[in-house]
């Protein structure tokens, strides 16, 4: 989920830290400049919103383990973000949020990706993730829909949309050639 500086400041303050919003902004900028963090913009947002509500990811998924107790799902999403950046570059990978929440969107491929630890045995999660693809089709009718999981594999159909469910290890091994820069 996108994280505003105000929200991050409030989270840190609730943990007992005395910190100002400008300090949080400075540290996030330092981490981004040091290549510890990277951002993804909202593909569906207007310019101002794109600049003010990016999603942040760590370049090293191990850093999440330092901050989160139960971080498997966050690490999986972060891993997918890193691989998408490797494949397509930061300027070509987005998240999509406009009455629809899609974890990753690659416009050049019309590729929409949701990340979930498991969906086959969890009906609520499966319905939530697949429902977002149905909503996305109102904006991008011919998008390819993929759910990356920790270990599950299947083909699902929802609202006439074919959704590929693929385990992360398999998706990572199917990595296309890295384009020459």
How would you describe each model-predicted region?
Residues 40, 96-98, 148-150, 166-168:
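Conserved beta-strand termini and adjacent loop/short-helix elements that scaffold enzyme active sites
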Residues 61, 115, 150-151, 168:
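Residues immediately flanking
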Residues 117-163:
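Catalytic cores of nucleic-acid endonucleases
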Residues 151-181:
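Domain-level recognition of nuclease-like catalytic cores that cleave nucleotide substrates
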Residues 83, 132-135, 168-171:
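Generic recognition of well-ordered alpha-helical segments
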Residues 1-112, 117:
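Accessory nucleic acid-recognition modules appended to NTPase machines
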Residues 6, 22, 74, 124-127, ...:
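Generic alpha-helical secondary structure signal
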């Amino acid at each position: 989920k996108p994280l505003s500086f105000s929200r991050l400041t409030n989270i840190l303050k609730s943990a007992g830290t005395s910190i100002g919003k400008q300090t949080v902004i400075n540290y996030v900028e330092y981490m981004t400049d040091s290549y510890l963090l990277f951002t993804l913009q909202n593909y569906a947002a207007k310019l101002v919103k794109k600049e003010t509500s990016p999603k942040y990811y760590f370049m090293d998924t191990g850093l999440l383990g330092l901050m989160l107790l139960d971080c498997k799902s966050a690490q999986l999403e972060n891993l997918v973000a890193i691989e998408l950046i490797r494949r397509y570059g930061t300027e070509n990978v987005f998240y999509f949020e406009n009455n629809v929440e899609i974890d990753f969107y690659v416009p050049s491929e019309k590729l929409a990706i949701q990340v979930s630890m498991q969906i086959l045995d969890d009906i609520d999660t499966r319905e939530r993730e697949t429902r977002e693809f149905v909503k996305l089709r109102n904006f991008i009718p011919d998008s390819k829909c993929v759910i990356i999981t920790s270990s599950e594999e299947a083909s699902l159909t929802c609202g006439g949309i074919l959704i590929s469910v693929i385990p992360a290890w398999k998706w990572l091994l199917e990595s296309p050639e890295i384009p020459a820069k």
